[in-house]
C-alpha cells in the first residue's frame, strides 16, 4: 500500500490539472495562432507561471484500492496484485483465468 501522503499528493495534482486545464488550453491555442516573437514569449511566460503540478504529464496512474503505481491495468484501474485477488474471488465480472 502506498503512503497516504503520496495518494493525497496525487489527488491534489488531479485537482490542479482540472482547475488549470481550460486556462492551459486557451494559452496553447493562442500560441498556435500568434506570429510575433514577442507575443510568443509572453504566452510562454504565462504558461510557465502556472503551477508545476497542474501539468497533466505529472500525473501517475494509481490503483484506486492500494495506491500502487507499478503494474497498473488501465482497463480496471487496479494494480496487478489486487486484480489477481479480485479475479480469484470472482469480483470482476467477465474475467476468466486463462488456460491453454
Swiss-Prot record:
Cross-referenced PROSITE patterns: RIBOSOMAL_S14 (PS00527)
Subcellular location: Plastid, Chloroplast
Entry's Gene Ontology cellular component terms: chloroplast; small ribosomal subunit
Entries under Gene3D superfamilies matching the protein: 1.10.287.1480
Gene Ontology MF: a single term: structural constituent of ribosome
Domain of life from the UniProt record: Eukaryota
UniProt similarity note: Belongs to the universal ribosomal protein uS14 family.
Function of the molecule: Binds 16S rRNA, required for the assembly of 30S particles.
Subunit structure: Part of the 30S ribosomal subunit.
Family annotation (HAMAP family): Ribosomal_uS14_1
Protein name: Small ribosomal subunit protein uS14c
Species this protein is from: Rhodomonas salina (Cryptomonas salina)
Lineage: Eukaryota, Cryptophyceae, Pyrenomonadales, Pyrenomonadaceae, Rhodomonas
Gene behind the chain: rps14
Amino acid at each position: 500500500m502506498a503512503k497516504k501522503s503520496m495518494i493525497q499528493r496525487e489527488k491534489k495534482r488531479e485537482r490542479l490539472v482540472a482547475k488549470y486545464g481550460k486556462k492551459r488550453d486557451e494559452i496553447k491555442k493562442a500560441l498556435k495562432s500568434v506570429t510575433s516573437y514577442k507575443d510568443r514569449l509572453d504566452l510562454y511566460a504565462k504558461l510557465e507561471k502556472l503551477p508545476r503540478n497542474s501539468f497533466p504529464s505529472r500525473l501517475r496512474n494509481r490503483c484506486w484500492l492500494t495506491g500502487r503505481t507499478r503494474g497498473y491495468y488501465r482497463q480496471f484501474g487496479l494494480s496487478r496484485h489486487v486484480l489477481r485477488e479480485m479475479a480469484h474471488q470472482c469480483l470482476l465480472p467477465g474475467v476468466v483465468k486463462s488456460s491453454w
